Amino acid sequence: MPPPSDIVKVAIEWPGAYPKLMEIDQKKPLSAIIKEVCDGWSLANHEYFALQHADSSNFYITEKNRNEIKNGTILRLTTSPAQNAQQLHERIQSSSMDAKLEALKDLASLSRDVTFAQEFINLDGISLLTQMVESGTERYQKLQKIMKPCFGDMLSFTLTAFVELMDHGIVSWDTFSVAFIKKIASFVNKSAIDISILQRSLAILESMVLNSHDLYQKVAQEITIGQLIPHLQGTDQEIQTYTIAVINALFLKAPDERRQEMANILAQKQLRYIILTHVIRAQRAINNEMAHQLYVLQVLTFNLLEDRMMTKMDPQDQAQRDIIFELRRIAFDAESEPNNSSGSMEKRKSMYTRDYKKLGFINHVNPAMDFTQTPPGMLALDNMLYFAKHHQDAYIRIVLENSSREDKHECPFGRSSIELTKMLCEILKVGELPSETCNDFHPMFFTHDRSFEEFFCICIQLLNKTWKEMRATSEDFNKVMQVVKEQVMRALTTKPSSLDQFKSKLQNLSYTEILKIRQSERMNQEDFQSRPILELKEKIQPEILELIKQQRLNRLVEGTCFRKLNARRRQDKFWYCRLSPNHKVLHYGDLEESPQGEVPHDSLQDKLPVADIKAVVTGKDCPHMKEKGALKQNKEVLELAFSILYDSNCQLNFIAPDKHEYCIWTDGLNALLGKDMMSDLTRNDLDTLLSMEIKLRLLDLENIQIPDAPPPIPKEPSNYDFVYDCN
C-alpha cells in the first residue's frame, strides 16, 4: 500500500553526525518537525534551528515552501535564519580581515534566500553594507597595496550581497544616500577595477535608475556616456551587456526634453560605431541577454522619432512651409524665381500648384495640409527632405520620371512618402515600449547614424520600382503599398547585416518574385482543398499528430533551460527542467549558469511525478502572473508564462525563453495529460507535414487531373441472363 500523500521521505544531515532517514508529515507544524529532529540528536533550544535544502541553493524550508519537499530530498539541520543573520551581522564587523572576508562570502551566498534576506534586513543590514561601501574603501586604502586581492574580494562579496538583498524588493531604492551613489559610480568610472566589482556596480546603477526617479537624477549627474564607453571596448561580453543596460536605463527614464540631448551625446561619442565594431561584429556569438539589450537600444532610438511622428504641420508656420519650397526647388531647380514683382501673383501661384502636383501632393494648392494627419505627421516631411538632400539624383529622377508620365500612371511621390513613413513606423513599432523578453534587433540599423532615414530612402526607391513593375495607376495605390510591405517584411526576416545587404535582398524580391511566391502559396492552398485531398488528409492526420506528439515528448526529454525573471531585470539565473525517458517524472533544479548541452537527470535535485499533475494553465491563469509587479503586467511575459498545478495549492511556474519553447512545452505537457495539442506551432507543423506527406503520395499522379467526385455508379442491366450458374 503506497504511503499517504502527506508523508514525504527525506534524509536530514547534521555536521559530525550520520544522516537520518525520516518521514515528514506535512500536516504537522514545521516547528514540531524541527523539534523532533533536534530531539533525535539531543539538541536543546530547537527554536534556534531550521531546515534548509542541502543542495547548492541552501534555501530555508518555511511554511510557505514546505510543499516543494519531495520524496528523496536531502535536507540539512542548521541555525535558524534569525540566528544566522544575527551571527553574520556581527561577523562582518569583525576587526579580522580574514573573518570579515569569510563572513561576507557567506552573506553573498545566503542573501539569495528571501527568508534569510528578510531577517538580515530587519537587523538594518542594508545600511551596514552601504556604510561599509562608503567608508570601507578609505579605511582600507592603506591596506590595498599589500592586500589588494583580499580587498577586491571583500568589496565584490559586499556588492554581491547588496544586489541579492535588494533583488527581493523588500527595501525601497529611494533610501540611499548621495555618498553611496557617488561611491558606486566611482567604481564604474575607474579605468582599472576588478571585473566582478564593475559588473555588480553597473547592475546597481541600472536598478537605481529603473526603480527611482530621484536616483535617476543623481546617477545621471555622476555617470556620463563617455565614462561608460570604454567598458564597451573591452572583450568581456557580460560587462558590455551591463553597460548597454545602464545606457538603456538612462535613456528610458530620461525626461522627454533630455532624450534628444542624450541621443546627440550618443552620436558625438560614436556609441553606435563602437557597439557595431566591438559587440555586433566581434568574433563571438551574441548571447540572448546582449541581444535583448541591443533590441531595447534599437527601440529607444527609434522612439525618438515619436515626437515628430505625432506632430501635425502648422500651415501658418513659415519655417515648415520653407521645407516644402526646398523640396520644390531641388526637384525643379527653379530658374531664378523673380525676386522683383514683375511676374503676376496669379502666374506664380499657378506655377507652384503645377509643381506641387508633379511632386505628388494630394493638396496641390496648399501641400502643408497633407502633413496634418498623425501618424506620420512631420516625420514624413523630414524623410522627404533627407532624401532630397542626401540622395538628390535619385530624388530628382523619381520626381521628373513620374511628372512625365500620364496622370493616372504617375507614382505620387508626396502621397507615397507619407504612407510609406506611416508603414515603416508600424513595422518598427515606433512609440511602443520595449518588450521584457524580445531580442529581435537588426544589425543593419547600427551601421548608420541616420538609419531610419536611410531605411526610408531605400524603401521609397523600392516603392517607385514596384509601381513601375506593376504598371500601377492611382486606383492601385493601396495594392502597391501592400506589395511593398510584403517585400520589406520578407527582407527584414533575413536579418541583413548592412543597409546595402538589405537593398540587395529587395532587388531579389521584385514584384514578379512576390507574384510567384503568392501564386505558389495560393496553388498549394487550392490543390489541397479538393474533396479527394481532404479525405486523404483526414485519413493520415492521426498519424501526423502522433508524430508531432512524439517529437514534443522527445524535446521534453532533452529538457530546456529556463531563465528566472524578477522585477529588477532579466537575471543570469537559470533552472532546468526535463522529462524522464519513460515519460513518468519531470526532473528540475537550479543552475549556476546557462548549460552547454543537456543537463543529466542526476544533477537535477527535484522531481515531479507526471501522475501528480492536475492541470496545465497559461497566461493570466498562472499563479505567478497574478502577483503584483510591473513585470507581471507585461503582455509579452504573459504570452510566455505557463504553470503546472499539482497536489493541493502547489505549482511549478515557467516563463519560456521564447514562443517556440512555450509551444513545445505546453504541447508536450498536454500530450502527457492526454489532452489535445492546441498551439500555433502544432497547427503549423500539422499543415507542413500533411502537405509534404500528401505531395509524396501524389507523386505518381503528376499531370493527372483528380476528379472532384468519384465516377458515377452505372445503371443496373435490363436483365441478368448473362449470369452463369455454376451449379
From Swiss-Prot:
Location of the ELMO domain: 319-492
Modified residues (N6-acetyllysine): 100, 105
Sites bearing Phosphoserine, chain numbering: 344
Gene3D superfamilies linked: 6.10.250.810, Leucine-rich Repeat Variant, Pleckstrin-homology domain (PH domain)/Phosphotyrosine-binding domain (PTB), SH3 Domains
Gene Ontology BP annotations: actin cytoskeleton organization; actin filament-based process; apoptotic process; cell motility; phagocytosis; phagocytosis, engulfment; Rac protein signal transduction; regulation of postsynapse assembly
Short motif SH3-binding, span: 707-714
PANTHER family noted in UniProt: ENGULFMENT AND CELL MOTILITY, ENGULFMENT AND CELL MOTILITY PROTEIN 1
Protein name stated in the entry: Engulfment and cell motility protein 1
Natural source organism: Mus musculus (Mouse)
Top-level taxonomy: Eukaryota, Metazoa, Chordata, Craniata, Vertebrata
